[in-house]
UniProtKB/Swiss-Prot annotation:
One of its GO terms (biological process) is defense response to bacterium. Keywords: Antibiotic, Antimicrobial, Bacteriocin. Residues 1-14 form a propeptide. It comes from Lactobacillus johnsonii (strain CNCM I-12250 / La1 / NCC 533). The keyword Magnesium does not apply. It comes from the Bacteria. This is Bacteriocin lactacin-F subunit LafX. Belongs to the bacteriocin class IIB family. Disulfide bonds: none annotated. This bacteriocin depends upon the complementation of two peptides for activity: LafA and LafX. Associated with a 180 kDa bacteriocin complex. The keyword Transmembrane helix does not apply.
Length: 62
């Protein structure tokens, strides 16, 4: 089965909490990558901070 452009434009899914989780995971990954040079503790702190920021924006964008 193939979907055309019209059908693809009408796909709706997810919710606020799902967006929050995905954004938090993405923010954590970005934070960890950004702070690799600061060692494991720096990566942990940046990962938590990135998750908090990503989760906040994922939750409030709706």
């Amino acid at each position: 089965m193939k979907l055309n452009d019209k059908e693809l434009s009408k796909i709706v899914g997810g919710n606020r909490w799902g967006d929050t989780v995905l954004s938090a995971a993405s923010g954590a990954g970005t934070g960890i990558k950004a702070c690799k040079s600061f060692g494991p503790w720096g990566m942990a702190i940046c990962g938590v901070g990135g998750a908090a920021i990503g989760g906040y924006f994922g939750y409030t964008h709706n």
